[in-house]
């Protein structure tokens, strides 16, 4: 829970993609601890249901919807369900994403390029496209998109991932300007090396692989999903009411080296 938390989100509704584990699950739980009811969306039904059950154990309502963010019909159906059950959408965390297989640009397959860009960038666009009209009807809201440290600098062997995450930052800034005057604040978070299942896959899940990844962090450790969740919840709160179109880097100093 955030410091000095007092349930400021009571009666409000949050929509979180990529909620089956990692940053998405931590953020869904953080919204619930702040008083919100939460719609959790993910392609993984088992993990998504586990997140929903944990939210209900916190005393908040939750619904789990299967959603492939590459598919406009899935995104629309998930948000239609949100309105059907809760009647409103106050916050959205567009977080679903996947890691890229390491490959230099010329060796990157078209299929891998399409997979990364369609999930990590197109998915965010589709969520925004269907979330924003619901917030317009409500008179406002707050949206946070997940970019990455790879959204603010380049990384060798990660052309598709870097391009997609830079795209999320650009999309966030453009959309923020489109809707700021309508009381819809849109921002992004740019996590560094966070201890999640995705990072385990990227590092190979071995102690040696993890240590190699940690060696890139000036702070000397991986970040925790809750550290990103706290930032997302803050960006959605009234404390951040003047923060618009910002890409918040949360990376232990990795990108300032």
Describe these PLM feature segments.
Residues 2-5, 99-102, 153, 233, ...:
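Short C-terminal tail/terminal secondary-structure segment
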Residues 7-39:
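Canonical Rossmann dinucleotide-binding motif of NAD(H)/NADP(H)-dependent dehydrogenases/reductases
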Residues 71, 188-191, 208-243, 252:
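C-terminal helical subdomain
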Residues 103-105, 109-114, 213:
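Substrate-binding pocket helix/loop in short-chain dehydrogenase/reductase
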Residues 128, 164, 172:
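Active-site helix of classical SDR
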Residues 148:
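Residue(s) in the substrate-gating loop at a strand-loop-helix junction
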Residues 180, 185, 243-245:
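Short, small/polar-rich loop/turn modules that mediate ligand/substrate recognition or access, typified
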